[in-house]
Amino acid sequence: MNPNQKIITIGSISLGLVVFNVLLHVVSIIVTVLILGRGGNNGICNETVVREYNETVRIEKVTQWHNTSVVEYMPYWNEGTYMNNTEAICDVKGFAPFSKDNGIRIGSRGHVFVIREPFVSCSPTECRTFFLTQGSLLNDKHSNGTVKDRSPFRTLMSVEVGQSPNVYQARFEAVAWSATACHDGKKWMTVGVTGPDSKAVAVVHYGGVPTDVVNSWAGDILRTQESSCTCIQGDCYWVMTDGPANRQAQYRIYKANQGKIVGQTDVSFNGGHIEECSCYPNDGKVECVCRDNWTGTNRPVLVISPDLAYRVGYLCAGLPSDTPRGEDAQFTGSCTSPMGNQGYGVKGFGFRQGTDVWMGRTISRTSRSGFEILRVRNGWTQTSKEQVRKQVVVDNLNWSGYSGSFTLPVELSGKYCLVPCFWVEMIRGKPEEKTIWTSSSSIVMCGVDYEVADWSWHDGAILPFDIDKM
């Protein structure tokens, strides 16, 4: 065979192999298409089938894997539907940890906001932590002087519950140095108070858009709850105060639908003082346990009906729950009048359980340190001192601060009642510690059907930071 014939033979064989390879690929593609086109009912391949029913309760997800079907029920919420929130509060035996953000510990080396007044509120699909930033980060020069409550740099922002208030995950909500927020089932509503002390303005946002305003009517630091507002069947309710912090002020209840104010009423409470109410839905009404910053060491109670009729008084229990306060043994309690004759105070909360009450308070009688929650038999309706349960959340060796209430809606929890939850703020820095800043983190607890052991879920940050040593 001459050289030309050898070249032709080798080329022919190579071309044949190429054609054969192409044919194999074509056959492989055809076989694959035919097998997949049969619907996968032979169970050879993994397959997920999602069936979306015309309900607001669930999506059924069926996963077929190696001839085995696994059915999961996934929470689903029709965003065009209002939450009900007319159910009763669940009766609980204790409170289990829900989340802890550890914001100050993380903030020593992370991009975490300087904050105060954190609170939690829930939609049908998630809970979020809201907080008032100081327009600055921990361990940064702009954190200097952030002990101040009101400034043009303060904003309301939020993250998913449990996340630190960091710059990467935080969502802007409103310009505010006082705020509240809640979800009606369709969208988030926020109320942010900002501006000068004598002419402050509260801007209502719905779905992230400004929809209404409330101007200061008494010209003396208009302010609101610093915790979740309350939505019932599409209408959202919150409480505002305007006037002195240490004597008679003026109080109003507001009602909004889709971010537009549709009603308001003045609360007549001569001799009593209401600030920073912690509110929650219960049996179709809004129940609030507030702060008396004037004289009382017992807490004001405000119960609001959908038509804005209200009942106002004090938490009856024969144990004080404000700080500072006197000895338990010397306190008698009252359902109608302030008791204890101690000025100042701290934001707190309580939950009605039939005629009983769960009431939170600092462990220290004189400072914002430690935190415990007590169940007092008949404490909602009588001046009872009978403690039937007590649970420690932060020990008295560690700082606490504000505390407040919220509930898990049935659409989120899957229960037939509203799960009572609370958060405890743990303030660090000025005025108690040698830093240039003031900030806080929080622990969040939710009611369960079991007793929960005492422990201390305190802040745990080691101070001072580098910025404090410069």
Curated annotation (Swiss-Prot):
Region of interest (Head of neuraminidase), ranges: 89-470
Reaction it catalyzes: Hydrolysis of alpha-(2->3)-, alpha-(2->6)-, alpha-(2->8)- glycosidic linkages of terminal sialic acid residues in oligosaccharides, glycoproteins, glycolipids, colominic acid and synthetic substrates
Main location: virion
Pfam families, A to Z: Neur
GO biological process: carbohydrate metabolic process; viral budding from plasma membrane
EC numbers: 3.2.1.18
Membrane topology, record value: Single-pass type II membrane protein
Residues annotated as glycosylated: 46, 54, 67, 84, 144, 293, 398
Alphabetically ordered keywords of this record: Calcium, Disulfide bond, Glycoprotein, Glycosidase, Host cell membrane, Host membrane, Hydrolase, Membrane, Metal-binding, Signal-anchor, Transmembrane, Transmembrane helix, Virion
Activity regulation as described: Inhibited by the neuraminidase inhibitors zanamivir (Relenza) and oseltamivir (Tamiflu). These drugs interfere with the release of progeny virus from infected cells and are effective against all influenza strains. Resistance to neuraminidase inhibitors is quite rare.
Positions of the catalytic residues: 149, 402
Region (Hypervariable stalk region): 32-86
InterPro entries, A to Z: Glyco_hydro_34, Sialidase_sf
SS bonds (residue pairs): 90-417, 122-127, 182-229, 231-236, 277-290, 279-288, 316-335, 421-446
Major enzyme class: hydrolase
Chain residues that bind Ca(2+): 292, 296, 322
Virion surface-facing ranges: 36-470
Required cofactor(s): Ca(2+)
Topological domain spans for side Intravirion: 1-14
Residues at which substrate binds: 116, 150, 275-276, 291, 368
Recorded family membership: Belongs to the glycosyl hydrolase 34 family.
Annotated HAMAP family: INFV_NRAM (MF_04071)
Function: Catalyzes the removal of terminal sialic acid residues from viral and cellular glycoconjugates. Cleaves off the terminal sialic acids on the glycosylated HA during virus budding to facilitate virus release. Additionally helps virus spread through the circulation by further removing sialic acids from the cell surface. These cleavages prevent self-aggregation and ensure the efficient spread of the progeny virus from cell to cell. Otherwise, infection would be limited to one round of replication.
Domain characteristics, as noted in the entry: Intact N-terminus is essential for virion morphogenesis. Possesses two apical sorting signals, one in the ectodomain, which is likely to be a glycan, and the other in the transmembrane domain. The transmembrane domain also plays a role in lipid raft association.
Additional remark text: The influenza A genome consist of 8 RNA segments. Genetic variation of hemagglutinin and/or neuraminidase genes results in the emergence of new influenza strains. The mechanism of variation can be the result of point mutations or the result of genetic reassortment between segments of two different strains.
UniProt name for this protein: Neuraminidase
Organism in which the protein naturally occurs: Influenza A virus (strain A/Duck/Chabarovsk/1610/1972 H3N8)
Lineage: Viruses, Riboviria, Orthornavirae, Negarnaviricota, Polyploviricotina
Gene from which this protein is expressed: NA
